[in-house]
Curated annotation (Swiss-Prot):
This is Patatin-like phospholipase domain-containing protein CaO19.1504. Belongs to the PLPL family. Residues 75-95 have a biased composition (Polar residues). SUPFAM superfamilies: FabD/lysophospholipase-like (SSF52151). Residues 396-588 form the PNPLA domain. Keywords: Hydrolase, Lipid degradation, Lipid metabolism, Membrane, Transmembrane, Transmembrane helix. InterPro entries: Acyl_Trfase/lysoPLipase (IPR016035), NTE (IPR050301), PNPLA_dom (IPR002641), Triacylglycerol_lipase_N (IPR021771). It comes from Candida albicans (strain SC5314 / ATCC MYA-2876) (Yeast). It is an enzyme of class 3 (hydrolase). Coiled coil: none annotated. A motif (GXSXG) lies at residues 427-431. The active site is at residues 429, 575. GO terms for cellular component: membrane.
Length: 852
């Protein structure tokens, strides 16, 4: 028997029962929640507390009089513990049948100063003789606070809150109500009707059209998967045979990234894909501009002309400069890109490091063994701030996908091992759990946690069928929100807020949630939109898929006194993947993100991933005959006809889904527009599509074992290996820019403070002298200064002559390679068909450098 390997922090759960109790209270008694009890004790209006309605919740609440140190007793005198409260219990209608009491949540200061108010509260909570039910009801409803409630919060299948309260044994308040109070007791307003559905023709034709559309989509889907099967079979039978199949299997079985690189280079060499990197010409990027930029940067760097060097860098440090970040540059080899692209990234990093050198902080450095220009520290800081804004930032986006989301652990581990984990991470539904773990732990802690033993902490689906089936029948959801709140505390490091997570790790967490109202906008919870919101509550909301988990209330820490209260006045929220699985636009708005690494594991989306022109690190490989006949580096997957049919059928299916959404034909089951789940943008700059086996669907709602977790992590790592080179190139420039921005800002602050040393932990996002920045650029020439920019960056006659010489050299190399190809064709019997056609040298040269 193998020895049990301990997990880092395995004995810690970070559960705060006080916070869980506040969450349970806000979840059920949304209308009766006493905000004043958690903030101040000086209010003159008291609301109906729920101490006697749910035994045990108040036992964990903070109190000023100290009476809550002991466990609270219910009406029958039985001691109850807050840990026993579950979502199933609190949704039971029996809790609404007990009388209200308002004696336990009142502080001493309120009792001493407002005795008359206490007497009124006693009359409200305990109707005495001579007091009618209507009087009690009117008094109570007038004192309850006005809260914002969601329009479409769903309730247990047995009925809504109002229906359960009308049963025998309900309180007097629920039995007889005036029209005004009846409206206020509901946590949801009357469902709004769509005016466009009132048309008689809509009513008559809606279902026939919907049946026709779904039938046509089904037929298209059958043809679509026939095309996919044809492509897969043809690749298996005709493309991957013999030695190339052995090398590909060797590549797939690589255990480490270094081993994967060696195997990928071996496969590239066998397929002669390494020769593609030697030719700089390619139709998907402007190689002439890249060449000229490299020559100018090298010349200015050797001459030490830093001012002009900064001008050139301002022009080229921007998103996808000259097509340098086009995915096709990394989709023609298993490992590698154009040699010219490699040279560009290396040269830009050298130039940025030269500017970032500490040789110009105001004093002359006699020890410097170069003649570089001296640049004022303020100009350098402004330069790094400008290029940081132009270049943008990278972000890791983790999709939802139930238990398929555990593949994100392997994706994150591969990035972490190469020190490439971005500082901005977003997650939705299951991906939010992994994103929360990444943003609440340091790199050292993550290396100890991203191991197979982490499966011991994943117990969300541990309830057997004889527990969750009755729960589903009672509440309409398989899982219990309060139970999940406790289990998620380990991954969120307790009741950590978004702001606290950023302060602890420096990473910015983003979790996408949507209001239960189908028409309200999506909110991306982060340190900007909701800095004091508790992360585990947003995880529950982001996982609230209908039938899986009911909508929940977000919780936040009061920044004044640290008390836990509902966020957004008690509105309920649900799964963000229903509308925004990958919030690319919001990330760009908040953090200037323009390079996204998307890990997409949604099974209903990954089925339609095809990549007809190949993807990063996974080129489309031609058959053996075509590879030997001519150096064809680009081809459509399965051939042009198969690719055209696949694109046609997929876009046709998407068109009909868009028609269903535009005409609002689909029924809004549980008040949710389900047509959005196929019509979102599910991809990013780099998209990882882990392959799922058919057997994986059996575990879609089950907890992984340590053995399965090991397989899942390894699968995620292997999916990430082909993309790491592209990410490494992007991160090499981004990291140098951020380093220069941070160091120059520190020195700039020291200069502003008269040479006094500043703390090491400097907020690099703090703007200094905004008015000055908006004015003169401090000596850094702007891209929009036409004369200066043309003088420094413009193409002179010498540059054009140099480019012509380079083109002539490339043409000579192409002609030599083409002669070799023709000789090889004459010696190959399999190429007799191609020899029957006359192919001119000019045609070969043009064909060589295009994807088509």
């Amino acid at each position: 028997m193998t020895e049990r390997i301990p997990l880092f922090e395995e004995d810690k759960d970070y559960i705060d029962e006080d916070h869980i109790s506040e969450f349970a209270k806000a979840l059920v008694w949304q209308d009766d929640y006493d905000y004043d009890a958690n903030t101040t004790a000086t209010t003159d209006i008291t609301t109906t507390p729920i101490n006697d309605e749910v035994p045990g919740i108040v036992s964990s609440l903070p109190s000023t009089n100290g009476n809550n140190k002991n466990k609270n007793k219910d009406i029958n005198g039985t001691v109850s513990d807050s840990s026993s409260i579950t979502d199933e219990d609190i949704m039971n209608s029996s809790y609404f049948d007990k009388p209200h009491s308002s004696t336990n949540l009142k502080s001493n200061s309120t009792k001493n100063d407002d005795d008359d108010d206490d007497d009124d509260d006693d009359l409200i909570s305990r109707p005495q003789s001579g007091t009618t039910d209507n009087t009690s009801t009117t008094s109570l409803s007038s004192k309850r606070p006005d809260l914002i409630t969601s329009k479409s919060d769903w309730f247990p299948i047995g009925g809504s809150r109002s229906s359960s309260s009308s049963k025998k044994g309900s309180s007097n308040y629920h039995k007889k109500t005036t029209p005004t109070s009846s409206t206020s007791t509901k946590s949801t307003i009357e469902i709004l009707k769509n005016e466009f559905r009132n048309s008689s023709t809509y009513t008559l034709l809606r279902w026939p059209i919907l049946i026709f559309v779904f039938s046509w989509i089904g037929i298209l889907g059958i043809f679509y998967f026939m095309i996919r099967i044809y492509v897969a079979v043809s690749e298996y039978l005709f493309t991957w045979r013999g030695e190339r199949k052995r090398l590909r299997n060797k590549l797939r079985n690589s255990k480490t990234y270094e081993e994967w690189i060696n195997n990928a280079l071996e496969l590239d060499k066998f397929l002669k894909l390494d020769k593609w990197s030697e030719n700089p010409k390619f139709s998907y990027y402007d190689y002439k501009t890249i060449k000229l930029t490299i020559l100018k940067l090298q010349k200015l760097r050797h001459q030490g002309k830093l001012i002009e060097l900064m001008v050139i860098l301002q022009g080229c440090l921007k998103k996808n400069f000259a097509g340098i970040e086009n995915r096709q540059l990394y989709s023609h080899r298993y490992y590698g890109t154009k040699n010219l692209v490699e040279e560009y990234y290396q040269e830009v990093v050298k130039c940025l490091e030269l500017i970032n050198q500490d040789n110009n902080n105001g004093d002359d450095n006699d020890d410097d063994d170069n003649d570089n220009e001296k640049i004022d520290i303020e100009k350098k800081w402004k330069f790094f701030k400008i290029v940081s804004k132009n270049y943008g930032k990278s972000a890791l986006c983790l999709s939802g996908g139930a238990c398929f989301a555990y593949t994100h652990f392997g994706i994150a581990k591969a990035l972490l091992d190469q020190n490439l984990l971005p500082q901005i991470i977003s997650g939705t539904s299951g991906g939010g759990l992994i994103a929360a773990l990444l943003c609440t732990r340091t790199n050292e802690e993550l290396k100890k946690l991203l191991v197979p033993q982490l499966a011991r902490k994943i117990t969300a689906c541990e309830d057997p069928w004889y527990i969750w089936i009755p729960r589903f029948l009672k509440t309409g959801a398989r899982f219990d929100a309060i139970d999940w709140a406790r289990k998620s505390n380990f991954f969120t490091h307790g009741s950590t807020t978004f702001e606290e997570a950023f302060q602890r790790t420096g990473r910015k967490l983003n979790i996408s949630t949507i209001p239960a109202d189908p028409h309200s906008p999506v909110i991306l919870c982060n340190d900007i939109t909701s800095p004091h919101c508790i992360i585990w509550s947003t995880l529950l909301a982001s996982s609230a898929v209908p039938g899986i988990l009911n909508p929940v209330v977000l919780m936040m820490k009061n920044p004044i006194n640290g008390k836990v209260i509902p966020f957004s006045l008690g509105s309920k929220w649900r799964d963000g993947s229903l509308r925004t699985d990958i919030p690319i636009e919001a990330l760009n708005t908040y953090y200037n993100v323009n390079f996204t690494i998307v890990s997409q594991v949604n099974p209903h989306i990954s089925l339609f991933f095809f990549a007809p022109k190949g993807t990063v690190g996974r080129p489309v490989t031609s058959s053996t005959r075509k590879t030997r006949s001519k150096q064809q580096y680009a081809s459509f997957r399965g051939g042009f006809i198969a690719t055209a049919l696949e694109q046609l059928l997929r876009l046709e299916i998407k068109k009909w889904l868009q028609i269903i959404k535009s005409l609002d034909l689909l029924p809004h089951f549980l008040q949710q527009d389900w047509s959005n789940i196929w019509l979102q943008n599910f991809t990013g700059t780099i998209t990882i599509w882990p392959k799922n086996k058919l057997s994986d669907f059996w575990y879609i709602l089950s907890d992984p074992t340590e053995f399965r977790m090991k397989e899942i992590i390894e699968k995620g790592e292997k999916c990430m290996f082909p993309r790491l080179l592209f990410i490494k190139h992007r991160a090499s420039i981004e990291n140098v820019i951020e380093k220069g921005k941070k160091l120059t800002l520190t020195k700039y602050k020291q200069l502003k403070s008269g040479g006094v040393d500043c703390d090491e932990d400097v907020d690099v996002d703090v703007d200094i002298d905004d008015e000055e920045e908006e004015g003169e650029s401090g000596g850094v020439v702007s891209d929009y200064d036409a004369q200066s920019f043309q003088k420094v960056v413009g193409w002179s006659n010498e540059d054009k002559k140099l480019l012509d010489e380079l083109d002539n050299e490339d043409e000579e190399e192409d002609e030599e390679e083409e002669e070799v190809d023709v000789d090889d064709d004459d010696d190959d019997d399999d190429d007799s068909l191609s020899d029957s056609f006359e192919i001119t040298t000019e045609h070969l040269k043009q064909r060589r450098n295009t994807i088509f």
